[in-house]
């Protein structure tokens, strides 16, 4: 969807089939990623006018064989990582192309974020390049299943919130490979957490301010557990870090 600022956005509506709370998750997950220095798409609150919904056949949802209009009003917008007229975007690259991703090491930081937020989905990524650029940049998209989607719970498991292939973790040789993101999570200031809640429209969490407060409090409590959760993935049957050289104390 092209918005009033001239940029294109992927827009999620309040009555999406996942859960209204996934709008909160997308916002929080993306903003937290930004704050620890990960390449994330810009996000915005998109006010979708009722007229646009009524007169756009594509803004319909198929549920149980019935077509239903998307809900107008405040929606979540994730800006295209590159405009359609300026470059190319791929949601998949083969292993042979990973050498052409200039920031593939950022997957280690995304893993730290996903363990912190208990992303119940596999890590989603967009690989993009402008014009005639030869190398791709990866941006981390779709944080909707952070905090276990609409449940706002944290059922941690070693293989949750990870990318589907190990090759993106080939550069991980020890704890230093998770820096600076891991240290930024562990030292994430409480004073930076609460303003994020003020950015979120109450409609996205049904006005349940206490539930949102509990979620943020739990996130603060989990800062010290991220290293342990990464270690659980390291020791899993996936054997994701084949180049790990550092001994774990």
Region spans (language model):
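Aromatic-acidic/polar surface patches that form glycan- and anion
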Residues: 22, 102-106, 208
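Conserved kinase catalytic-core helix
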Residues: 86-126, 180-183
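Short alpha-helical "patches" and their helix-cap loops
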Residues: 40-49, 123-130, 232-237
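C-terminal catalytic region of ATP-dependent kinase domains
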Residues: 14, 130-249
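Short, flexible segments with low predicted structural confidence
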Residues: 4-6, 95, 190-191
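Catalytic micro-motifs at enzyme active sites that drive phosphoryl/nucleotidyl and oxygen chemistry
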Residues: 63-67, 99, 128
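Conserved ATP-binding subdomain of kinase catalytic cores across diverse folds
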Residues: 1-91, 114-120, 136, 143-150, ...
